[in-house]
Amino acid sequence: MRSAQVYRWQIPMDAGMVLRDRRLKTRDGLYVCLREGEREGWGEISPLPGFSQETWEEAQIVLLAWVNNWLAGDGELPQMPSVAFGVSCALAELADTLPQAANYRAAPLCNGDPDDLILKLADMPGEKVAKVKVGLYEAVRDGMVVNLLLEAIPDLHLRLDANRAWTPLKGQQFAKYVNPDYRHRIAFLEEPCKTRDDSRAFARETGIAIAWDESLREPDFAFVAEEGVRAVVIKPTLTGSLEKVREQVQAAHALGLTAVISSSIESSLGLTQLARIAAWLTPDTIPGLDTLDLMQAQQVRRWPGSPLPLVDADVLEQLL
């Protein structure tokens, strides 16, 4: 006997949260809970404004239609990426095919005063890997901050993300302020320039390795080994089903590329599932999941060690 619930939710965000030049005041999304006999599985559907092609309102229509079909015995996955991902997670939990083991290690997202960051990062146990958003301020300032962090902490490796913010000139301005002796400790810089060709040129000219992120979701993208390209950053909410995520990880690994499972600012429920996916598909790589602190609450499932209050499913708005 099958049954299902769909919940709609909204979480207040930190006041300073800006995405693609827009302030994100709340994170909006949906949960689906599927039950069959004694088993149940949960999934999160939370399109990311400015990044997902679909809105959560559009996702809600597709999700409710899919759930009704599933209740009637038809389980074919929808095409819409956020719905395909959430539904496939719920089905995987239902079938017990999503391993429970999770990788809760985080590459902390660094912002704020560099002196405070140095103290925080110096105290990090184990492998020191952190993420810095660049491209939000002047490229010269970004270069100086990155150089300062690498100089102060000799065993630190940084993942940088420019979200295609730079022209070739700005990329050169950034690199000019990063000591060539430190550049090998930039694990990768995600999508430095507005075009892939400009990003490739940046890698060749600076010796700073790059990673593809947005490019993975473009129709002309192909997985190929390229000089200067070290990694791909996979955001499952923007990618689609678990199977598609696994195919992309396998394609990257076959080329010797690092594959990083990364957050699209999901709630704690979605983040704990991403931590399980990371442990399963990319066990040797620290995932990019340090986004929970951008929110003011957790929901349904806790992220280990988070002090944020937990909201239970029974107080969420139930649509089905």
Swiss-Prot record:
Pfam families: MenC_N, MR_MLE_C. GO terms for biological process: menaquinone biosynthetic process. GO terms for molecular function: magnesium ion binding; O-succinylbenzoate synthase activity. Its EC number is 4.2.1.113. The keyword Metal-binding applies. It catalyses: (1R,6R)-6-hydroxy-2-succinyl-cyclohexa-2,4-diene-1-carboxylate = 2-succinylbenzoate + H2O. Pathway: Quinol/quinone metabolism; 1,4-dihydroxy-2-naphthoate biosynthesis; 1,4-dihydroxy-2-naphthoate from chorismate: step 4/7; Quinol/quinone metabolism; menaquinone biosynthesis. It is an enzyme of class 4 (lyase). It comes from the Bacteria. InterPro entries: Enolase-like_C_sf, Enolase-like_N, Enolase_C-like, Mandelate_racemase_C, OSB_synthase_MenC1, OSBS_N. Its cofactor is a divalent metal cation. Mg(2+) binds at residues 161, 190, 213. The active site is at 133 (proton donor), 235 (proton acceptor). Keywords: Lyase, Magnesium, Menaquinone biosynthesis, Metal-binding. PANTHER family: O-SUCCINYLBENZOATE SYNTHASE, O-SUCCINYLBENZOATE SYNTHASE-RELATED. Belongs to the mandelate racemase/muconate lactonizing enzyme family. MenC type 1 subfamily. Converts 2-succinyl-6-hydroxy-2,4-cyclohexadiene-1-carboxylate (SHCHC) to 2-succinylbenzoate (OSB). This is o-succinylbenzoate synthase.
